[in-house]
Amino acid sequence: MVHIHAEGPAFFCWIPKLFGKRVISTIHGLDWDREKWRGSVASKFIRGGEKNAVKYADEIIVLSKDVQKYFLETYGRETHFIPNGVNRPEVREAKLITDHFGLEKDSYILFLGRLVPEKGIRYLV
């Protein structure tokens, strides 16, 4: 069995099939639609990977319900929804953190995520 992560690498998921291997493709998101790839040759290649995953992968795993819906509506392809998981953090009293960093209530905004256009940080700032 071969497990391929992301749409770009999925372009090549037909190769293991030549050797009789089962292929699982995990799609982390619609990479071809990310702002940094839009309108580029890379976007077309990545989209080709998505189509090859649909055509050749024995199973497709997606990380969000929206992507699952997209694959069903666009390709009629059933997928397995397995969300990313995290360990629950230790709950601390907010006062411990605000006192430590000298923060006042309603005087700050916290953003956790990659600094990439699709996260929309420009709307937050």
Map each language-model feature to its residues.
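Membrane-proximal helix-turn-helix segments that form the acceptor-binding/catalytic region
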Residues: L18-F19, V41-I60
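A short helix/loop element that forms part of the nucleotide-sugar donor recognition site in Leloir-type
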Residues: V91-L103
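Conserved donor-binding/catalytic core segment of Leloir-type glycosyltransferases
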Residues: G102-K119, V125
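Carbohydrate-associated surface elements
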Residues: D66, G85
